[in-house]
């Protein structure tokens, strides 16, 4: 458990509280309302919450072996929420856990390999429970509280850079084991796309049914619908050329006449003639 130099009892009307960015930005008028402690420091709630977030974020980063903290008061965005857990098992209130969530706009692959764009996707950004409270049901209680308040379900959440403990937590409590391989640091579990609500648009703005699919054998993206459309368009153009050539007074063996009648211009560049494999006869001379 994490102890602080100040009393946190008044910060926790219940065991789990919800902290957002606007609650960490005090106004000047608020600063005048609070008295000074015996140490001469402000007793503002926002300042204390900021200190709690910074310390808990540092502990979470150390537990995961990260060089920089994921959670801090300065980094908390307007679309992110931090859930703090505390208890008074030792006779006074102490912080025991932190859970940071938010929404992300992601480009992901579904189970069929199709490339999709997901807007406002639920994301687990940071999760930490103090070592003295692990394997006691505290993490599950904090996670369930978050799901209820956010209106999310576990299999619809993406996880940013999950640790081995986080993966084991999701497998133990929610049976989420099999993941969908992605090209970024987020983990998606199978079943994420089963609900029709998650039918999203592809990167091109079209419904991601066949376009933007990934070729597993070649390792790159194949625009199937676009390729098929181009093939059909090319076949139609060739059929038009053949019909025009066969219906005129000259046959296909006189290619230069066909090309001139279709495009209404003559090929005068020698480089173009060489590329097309044609020879133009002008004034009885060959070029």
From Swiss-Prot:
It is found in: Midbody, Midbody ring. It is an enzyme of class 2 (transferase). One of its GO terms (cellular component) is Flemming body. Disruption phenotype: Viable and fertile. Ovaries are normal 0-7 days post eclosion but show increasing levels of incomplete egg chamber and cyst separation in older animals. Reduced levels of alpha-tubulin acetylation in early syncytium cysts and up to stage 5 germline cysts during oogenesis, but no change in somatic cells. Leakage of cytoplasmic material from germline cells into somatic follicular cells, possibly due to a compromised plasma membrane barrier between these cells. This may aberrantly affect follicular cell fate, compromising egg chamber development. Pfam families: Acetyltransf_16. It catalyses: L-lysyl-[alpha-tubulin] + acetyl-CoA = N(6)-acetyl-L-lysyl-[alpha-tubulin] + CoA + H(+). The keyword Transferase applies. The record marks 64 as: Crucial for catalytic activity. Keywords: Acyltransferase, Transferase. Specifically acetylates 'Lys-40' in alpha-tubulin on the lumenal side of microtubules. Promotes microtubule destabilization and accelerates microtubule dynamics; this activity may be independent of acetylation activity. Acetylates alpha-tubulin with a slow enzymatic rate, due to a catalytic site that is not optimized for acetyl transfer. Enters the microtubule through each end and diffuses quickly throughout the lumen of microtubules. HAMAP family: mec17. PANTHER family: ALPHA-TUBULIN N-ACETYLTRANSFERASE 1. This is Alpha-tubulin N-acetyltransferase 2. It comes from Drosophila melanogaster (Fruit fly). The gene is lky.
